[in-house]
Amino acid sequence: MNLATNRALLKPFTQAEFPTLEAAAHPHVPAHLMPEYWQAANRHLVKKILCEFTHEKIISPQIYRQAAGINHYELRLKDCTYYFSARHYQLDHLEIEAGSIRVSSAGQDKPLDAMSLIIKLKDALGMSETLLPTYLEEITSTLYSKAYKLAHQAIPATTLAKADYQTIEAGMTEGHPVFIANNGRIGFDMQDYDQFAPESASALQLVWIAVRKDKTTFSSLEGLDHDSLLKQELGEQFTKFQQHLSALGQAADSFYFMPVHPWQWREKIARTFAGEIARGDIIYLGESQDCYQVQQSIRTFFNLSAPQKCYVKTALSILNMGFMRGLSPLYMSCTPQINAWVADLIESDSYFAEQGFVILKEIAAIGYHHRYYEEALTQDSAYKKMLSALWRESPLPHIEPQQTLMTMAALLHVDHQEQALLAALIKHSGLSAKEWVKRYLNLYLSPLLHAFFAYDLVFMPHGENLILVLDAGIPVKILMKDIGEEVAVLNGSEPLPQEVQRLAVELEEEMKLNYILLDIFDCIFRYLAPILDKQTEVSEAQFWELVADNVRDYQAQHPQLADKFAQYDLFKDSFVRTCLNRIQLNNNQQMIDLADREKNLRFAGGIDNPLAAFRQSHAFGNQKLKPKS
């Protein structure tokens, strides 16, 4: 083609023929990427880096002045020095005053920059050149997320304390309290973020597909079959989907129906499973009539249209906080059976019911087997976890009409004015802070202790995995979720049924107690104590005494477990300092190998146990029970 003689191709366009920014479906620059939000996001993340890397002994800031319980620190790096003020709490926790942080270079203060700080620390972090760029991208994405929350989530703690369940869920701003890069979401673009990030609180529709039964695993609780479940979840759409298959000349009874994350369908399934789609083994059916809201875990959905219906959890092949967030078809094959076994155990022991501890069961699961990847890959791989889903009970049937729900992550939430939701919730309840905390510990800590000591059973008890049931702000029940992937039986003395063998975990005996001391004390209570100390009348010392009281009372009620209490001593002087950020820094593609949970763990010496101070008065055999007030 001769462009010089083809005038039509050279005809200039007028400005009116070009799309304008206003006409675009999405803005080219997100509104939250403004200097004030970006600076605030960096200050927040620099504060967290200084806190958590000090806790994990990656850095060692030095005290240069002390005054009235506040220490003034400096961290000298190669070409700059960071200065900040903080209170030192138990478990080597620095509660840093965000406004006190400054960085000086060549005698001049510089803007706080989380990316710059990570790069300056890269030798101390010990990351490979291969992994570092991905980690930096995760840091940037975490800053992006924080800036969004600063711009769009200005709900005061006092308002959130009385808000509905899904408003609170979307109002959480921190994510995992320990991890620095906790909002990576590698794979989402700007528009995906607006649609699929939990903090966007978007109402969205799931994609539904039909998958051929002979290539798919479906499992469910006894007495529940695929058609019964899907008729309940889909309503009239179930019949419409069957009619659609018939119109295509397909036998409806040769297929299961499966929900898929819209991003997963667009970015992964439509391409990676193209052969299956072309052969008619996977058939697109349409979008759900019901609307859903993404939960904090980013791949779980709450049904907004019919809240009594199930949560839906789907595979989502984005990299987020050390894992590709897929779901294994192999795991789906026994997930309901594991849930049934755990629920039967919990429900058969009256102690759990007395404490108000309830399991939200995953009642059914489905997984499509991509034969090529399963044949080609012998090791665990994200490519074998792209197309699965499960259904989990809604929390609504477990509460009374006057009761409300709140993610336990909310207890660590602090609003943009540094006001804690926990303090607002306690005030709303009308209870004293001490009484509120006692009731909370009875609901949360006591059942976890009983599961550990009586059954060698552990959960993943971080805030996002638990739902508080509140009555006028008073905690009355607690709901535990994410059972199939997160529960384990540690060095169990009794053989497990074949269908739940996956729960059995063998590990060094000295590491077993870490499931209490790390997961609860270090990852939850380390943050809870300073909030109570600063914003309620419960001091840090009083909080740890309440924890010690709870342990003492539990052990006194179960003297038959005395040997276990001695073997796994909750009042011992110290425990191993397990470093979660170091684990992510070591391998941010897959932090933990589920086949060998200890292999990737990273440690940094010991850490003093706050309960050691109560050994003489509270350890089993020494207890003197306080009269109930």
From Swiss-Prot:
Pfam families, per database record: FhuF, IucA_IucC
EC number(s) stated in the UniProt entry for this protein: 6.3.2.63
Molecular function terms, GO-annotated: acid-amino acid ligase activity; ATP binding
UniProt key word RNA-binding: no
A GO BP entry: siderophore biosynthetic process
Transmembrane domains' residue ranges: none
Activity regulation summary: Requires Mg(2+) for activity.
This protein's UniProt keywords: ATP-binding, Ligase, Magnesium, Nucleotide-binding
Assembly and oligomerization: Homodimer.
Listed name of the protein: Putrebactin synthase
Source lineage: Bacteria, Pseudomonadati, Pseudomonadota, Gammaproteobacteria, Alteromonadales
